[in-house]
């Protein structure tokens, strides 16, 4: 097992990819109402600012700004996963091995998640663009504006993006692989 060390910064800005255990499932969209409830509950107990989010059937991308006095993004991800898992019908629960059972896991999520500490404005811009273009990359829609499960529409209303953004994407964005 690799010796991976995460970078923790109070008030840090992070990009995450969080993935279902079974990538063939569509539970994040099928149970979007349950996911939204789990997300709100997580924010109530472990606040953070959602800079950008895109929810796909089997994984999600999230850019999170932590509070100034807090660097514990791992706890927030853990609580979000748990809150969502508990809301799913029992038939969604995965195959249990002894290790997962001891940890109280329900077999919904991959244990780990991908995390990237965002270093500057240019890095942030690339991550946001990647997140919003992801449904097109995965062939769920042909235009970014057609994907309902992202904060893209909020950012259009705020004037950060034109609603037609992503109709003709830069080759740089389409080559990024952050899944």
Provide a role label for each language-model segment.
Residues 1-179:
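Short catalytic/metal-binding and nucleic-acid-binding patches
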């Amino acid at each position: 097992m690799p010796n991976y060390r995460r970078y923790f910064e109070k008030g840090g800005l992070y990009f995450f990819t969080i993935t279902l255990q079974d990538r063939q499932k569509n539970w994040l969209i099928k149970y979007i109402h349950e996911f939204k409830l789990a997300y709100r509950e997580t924010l109530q107990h472990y606040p953070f600012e959602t800079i950008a989010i895109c929810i796909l059937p089997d994984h999600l991308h999230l850019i999170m700004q932590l509070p100034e006095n807090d660097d514990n993004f791992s706890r927030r991800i853990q609580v979000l996963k748990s809150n969502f898992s508990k809301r799913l019908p029992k038939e969604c629960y995965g195959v249990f091995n002894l290790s997962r059972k001891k940890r109280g896991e329900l077999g919904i999520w991959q244990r780990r998640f991908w995390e990237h500490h965002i270093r500057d404005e240019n890095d942030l811009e690339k991550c946001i663009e990647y997140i919003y273009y992801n449904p097109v990359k995965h062939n769920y829609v042909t235009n970014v504006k057609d994907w309902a499960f992202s904060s893209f529409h909020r950012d259009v209303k705020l004037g950060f993006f034109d609603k037609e953004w992503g109709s003709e994407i830069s080759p740089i964005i389409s080559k990024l692989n952050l899944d």
